[in-house]
UniProtKB/Swiss-Prot annotation:
Intrachain S-S bonds: none
The encoding gene: RPL44
Residue segments, region Disordered: 37-56
Protein name as catalogued: Large ribosomal subunit protein eL42
Entry's Gene Ontology molecular function annotations: structural constituent of ribosome
InterPro entries, A to Z: Ribosomal_eL44, Ribosomal_LSU_eL42, Ribosomal_zn-bd
Cited SUPFAM superfamilies: Zn-binding ribosomal proteins
Entry's family note: Belongs to the eukaryotic ribosomal protein eL42 family.
GO biological process: translation
Organism: Pichia kudriavzevii
GO cellular-component term (any): ribosome
Keywords, comma-separated and alphabetical: Ribonucleoprotein, Ribosomal protein
Length: 106
């Protein structure tokens, strides 16, 4: 299990800062895919009408986890940067610190 604090002091390369400042940490989440991107328009056009599925559907999934991406926002100048972590099954943001001899809980 990976537990990351909600704030973190790290280097900010914004135009005003260019020094180590406090950053607010959130987990990156992919945005909703646009219906009007060229690939989606082409795919929808190809799919319409008779003839079933026109492109291969991917089935051979190999990975069981995704890499965690942190989004760091500078408290001073609001500049955002992204930081990727290693793969993990359980990710927690701002959870309790672990005590000695305590049992693991999910």
């Amino acid at each position: 299990m990976v537990n990351v604090p909600k704030t973190r002091k790290t280097y900010c390369k914004g135009k005003q800062c260019k020094k180590h400042t406090q950053h607010k940490v959130t987990q990156y989440k992919a945005g909703k895919a646009s219906l009007y991107s060229q690939g989606k328009r082409r795919y929808d056009r190809k799919q319409s009408g008779y003839g079933g599925q026109t492109k291969p559907v991917f089935h051979k999934k190999a990975k069981t986890t995704k890499k965690v991406v942190l989004r760091l926002e500078c408290v001073a100048c609001k500049t955002k940067l992204q930081l990727s972590l290693k793969r993990c099954k359980h990710f927690e943001l701002g959870g309790d610190k672990k005590q000695k001899g305590a049992a693991l809980q999910f």
